């Protein structure tokens, strides 16, 4: 990772469910640490639980909701 790449820190506030063909992706709602009034839904690969801090390379894209 380049040291000049801007990143955004986000805290997992709720785990919404598993998705992906084999359940390897978790859909979570995150709250940005620099702007706590803003929350988005993201897909996360790998183990994740509430109160984890994620480093987002891109913070504008939001995941589609599970059905």
UniProtKB/Swiss-Prot annotation:
Please name the GO terms of the biological process aspect recorded for this protein, alphabetically. maturation of SSU-rRNA; ribosomal small subunit assembly; translation
Pfam families on file: Ribosomal_S28e
- List the GO molecular function terms: structural constituent of ribosome
- Top-level taxonomic group: Eukaryota
Example GO CC term: the record gives:
cytosolic small ribosomal subunit
Q: Known SUPFAM superfamilies for this protein?
A: Nucleic acid-binding proteins
What InterPro entries is this protein classified in?
NA-bd_OB-fold (IPR012340), Ribosomal_eS28 (IPR000289), Ribosomal_eS28_CS (IPR028626)
Which keywords fit this entry according to its UniProt record? Ribonucleoprotein, Ribosomal protein
Q: What family, per the record?
A: Belongs to the eukaryotic ribosomal protein eS28 family.
Q: What is this protein called?
A: Small ribosomal subunit protein eS28
Origin organism is Eremothecium gossypii (strain ATCC 10895 / CBS 109.51 / FGSC 9923 / NRRL Y-1056) (Yeast)
Q: Which gene encodes it?
A: RPS28A
